[in-house]
Amino acid sequence: MKTIECKAPAKVNYRLDVLRRRPDGYHDLRMIMQRIDLCDDIRISLSETPGVRVACGKEGVPDGPGNIAWRAADALLKLSGRCTGIDISIVKNIPVAAGLGGGSSDCASALMGVNELLELHLTDEQLMEAGSKLGADVPFFIFKKTALAEGIGDKLAAVEAAPAWLVIVNPNLAVSTAWVYQNLQLTAGKDEYIIPRFYGSVSDICAILANDLEKVTIGRFPVINQIKQKLLQVGAAGSLMSGSGSTVFGIFAEEAPARKAAEKLSRESDWFVAAVKTL
């Protein structure tokens, strides 16, 4: 049976502003989102056995309907009207519940892969619309560009950002996004700030690094602030928590100092550490 293999990249947030709470309980956001080459490995196959099956084997990642990649494949299979099966294998290289969008990226890969396997010929816009019903970050991974994301993250506009190397550090802590938002104290006045659409250098990127969720997560997990400081000490031009945490990244202009910093932090801790480049 036909099979597709693909990479599902992680993301970081160069900026995350929480503007207001919406009547539906969600929040209006404004974010700069950047894909990186830390990827899950996805394999999607057609099967003669009807239904959708997801195999992962990673603690904290469900295999059935609790996995949004499963729900993505199930939705498109029902849309096709075909009595066939879809098997999805996920090798998790992206830390789970870490602010890197791994689950959303897996979901986006499932939508794009199943669309191809079943020859549905859905456009990226149609896939993004379907993805927005499954997870706020899913459309971004179908968009495949550095983006200014607004609304709940589903309104996307392309942004130009200089290539960079990042050192990703995760202290092996899973953070509940819902808990972070529930404990967030909103501040007024964010709407007036104009987000640039062009970042010609790492210095330009560092100038807009900010995350409204940091204070909440650091309040519960002070190690996140310690990691931010360590990244600056080993040469990062700037450091920031990604998403709701607990991953922190440091930004570098060149590969060699990024790899050197990652090696040093790996030797000194039992944290997940990786030097990655932007996509």
From Swiss-Prot:
EC number: 2.7.1.148
Catalysed reactions, semicolon-separated: 4-CDP-2-C-methyl-D-erythritol + ATP = 4-CDP-2-C-methyl-D-erythritol 2-phosphate + ADP + H(+)
Gene Ontology molecular-function annotations: 4-(cytidine 5'-diphospho)-2-C-methyl-D-erythritol kinase activity; ATP binding
Active-site residues (renumbered): 11, 137
Pathway info: Isoprenoid biosynthesis; isopentenyl diphosphate biosynthesis via DXP pathway; isopentenyl diphosphate from 1-deoxy-D-xylulose 5-phosphate: step 3/6
Enzyme class of the recorded protein, top EC level: transferase
GO BP terms in the entry: isopentenyl diphosphate biosynthetic process, methylerythritol 4-phosphate pathway; terpenoid biosynthetic process
Keywords: ATP-binding, Isoprene biosynthesis, Kinase, Nucleotide-binding, Transferase
Gene3D superfamilies: 3.30.230.10, GHMP kinase, C-terminal domain (3.30.70.890)
Sequence positions that bind ATP: 95-105
Role: Catalyzes the phosphorylation of the position 2 hydroxy group of 4-diphosphocytidyl-2C-methyl-D-erythritol.
Record-stated family: Belongs to the GHMP kinase family. IspE subfamily.
Protein name: 4-diphosphocytidyl-2-C-methyl-D-erythritol kinase
Organism encoding this protein: Geotalea daltonii (strain DSM 22248 / JCM 15807 / FRC-32) (Geobacter daltonii)
The organism's taxonomic lineage, starting at the top: Bacteria, Pseudomonadati, Thermodesulfobacteriota, Desulfuromonadia, Geobacterales
